Amino acid sequence: MALLMRLLTLALALSVGPAGTLAGPAKSPYQLVLQHSRLRGRQHGPNVCAVQKVIGTNKKYFTNCKQWYQRKICGKSTVISYECCPGYEKVPGEKGCPAALPLSNLYETMGVVGSTTTQLYTDRTEKLRPEMEGPGSFTIFAPSNEAWSSLPAEVLDSLVSNVNIELLNALRYHMVDRRVLTDELKHGMTLTSMYQNSNIQIHHYPNGIVTVNCARLLKADHHATNGVVHLIDKVISTITNNIQQIIEIEDTFETLRAAVAASGLNTVLEGDGQFTLLAPTNEAFEKIPAETLNRILGDPEALRDLLNNHILKSAMCAEAIVAGMSMETLGGTTLEVGCSGDKLTINGKAVISNKDILATNGVIHFIDELLIPDSAKTLLELAGESDVSTAIDILKQAGLDTHLSGKEQLTFLAPLNSVFKDGVPRIDAQMKTLLLNHMVKEQLASKYLYSGQTLDTLGGKKLRVFVYRNSLCIENSCIAAHDKRGRFGTLFTMDRMLTPPMGTVMDVLKGDNRFSMLVAAIQSAGLMEILNREGVYTVFAPTNEAFQAMPPEELNKLLANAKELTNILKYHIGDEILVSGGIGALVRLKSLQGDKLEVSSKNNVVSVNKEPVAETDIMATNGVVYAINTVLQPPANRPQERGDELADSALEIFKQASAYSRAAQRSVRLAPVYQRLLERMKH
């Protein structure tokens, strides 16, 4: 009962917020960032918030955890200052900001938050100031003084030339006829403004930044007697066109316009939703080689993939980007959208030339470079962007590169450049065949490969797939990087050249003079049939040198005992195919003899039972061969090791028994006696 009461007390404590109130709904991202800023500023007194200012600019941000430690925003260094949190002010002689700001009407509150220019323009109209000072409940997104001063002169002149129509309408568009706080500003919502019920777009991002028509909230939730004031960094204007309509009227989108029409994506860009279009200008298309561009424009599927790669699934305003973030496109790819100073970047490159062109269904950023996805590229183009350029050069020398630029459904198993660090192989008929065996006759995806699968190549070979815990291999070569899936082909980056099998394990051993003594031993033991038939074996093949290193009397004794010879040879044969790329730190491989082999790899050196392997991955149709310069001994043939194991087992038994009785504890003291008896058994 006492335990139950403690649990109930804990549950009640967790469900109750500050001052005994029930815990409320989850805080919005903005409120969470503000809370973090409060925590960082509390050492300076009550209601103090830490603020990060970007050095060399007037930009300030409430600090989140990541920015606090990095001290950077958009790659620029920041300095920390401490200010009164929204709604509070200092009191002379007291620490922090202990006093709540006295409530005034909307008009007066705009002056408090630093929007005196908005006050000035409000005074110029006949109707607006009385509304702001009178009864009612309103929200105003008040532009900062800097926002007004940054307006183009012709825009400002048109507003002030007709204050009771143009200026009044512009100011009313910044107002909503009810109180709206940041916790109500949901991502992707629209608010109805007081100018002809025109919509205002709201975006509330996970990093705590809130935008209104892509203008950032600088100071939020300043209460007034008749509403609330949010200070924003831009003067906002009405949005009338959708994305497709903007494409239609912009001269710089002539090529994009034609491409969208040909792809049928115009229905998407004029429909409902909130998208970001990274809109390539005419100049962006002109940078692409004519052959490549014509190929894509003439291929409906590639064209659609190209355009989908320029459409983000959500609206992303420039002011919301303070660091790199991955964003998904309509095509399912991801782009890294970031910033460097005042410039927006895509995949680390500053390609955005004009930003935040607002549409009713999203936002447009002009880009001066085409973002071609892998799915619209040929295999040759994919390879040109990967660390396999040497393999491509070899293909070109062999006259085989046309396979990678056409419409053949292929998967190219391309060795890394590092594979050729010792030189490029000579191009002859045999090398051409080997290169063709690096081209699989279908477009694959590595995530669908499975162990035991066979792949047909242009060179006429069947390649086997081996799946291990931490690697995926095709014959002796393992995939070293993520697939690149192109329009018709897929690029697999491989860690070595393939060596397709040329015969059975027995064929391999017979064809290599190093193994002549092993072949004779296999024949003597009657194991030829096993190594000639279909199967999956890993053979650690002792070389002639290994047999010659044995004491003559021991070797003669072994060869004279057919049963013992068979036992030892079977211990050298694993019951599955294990290529070196699948080994990892340690693999215990069961042998045909029954005991397990310990195979390990460290610093590119493969060992079996701690003995280094002389040569790895000699592929056969029914297995793989490793050359070793030692004859391995099964555990039963290692008396010292066997005795140690028995001794360890005896000690363990007595240790376990000691946990249960005093008699068992006395038995543990007898363990050294048993140890000595076992030592005698070994001799």
From Swiss-Prot:
Residues 1-23 form the signal peptide. Expressed in heart, kidney, liver, skeletal muscle, testis, thyroid and uterus. It comes from Mus musculus (Mouse). Keywords: Cell adhesion, Disulfide bond, Extracellular matrix, Gamma-carboxyglutamic acid, Phosphoprotein, Repeat, Secreted, Signal. Residues 103-236, 240-371, 375-498, 502-632 form the FAS1 domain. This is Transforming growth factor-beta-induced protein ig-h3. Binds to type I, II, and IV collagens. Gamma-carboxylation is controversial. Gamma-carboxyglutamated; gamma-carboxyglutamate residues are formed by vitamin K dependent carboxylation; this may be required for calcium binding. According to a more recent report, does not contain vitamin K-dependent gamma-carboxyglutamate residues. The EMI domain contains 2 expected intradomain disulfide bridges (Cys-49-Cys85 and Cys-84-Cys-97) and one unusual interdomain disulfide bridge to the second FAS1 domain (Cys-74-Cys-339). This arrangement violates the predicted disulfide bridge pattern of an EMI domain. The gene is Tgfbi. Its main location: secreted. The modification S-cysteinyl cysteine is found at C65. The modification Phosphoserine is found at S37.
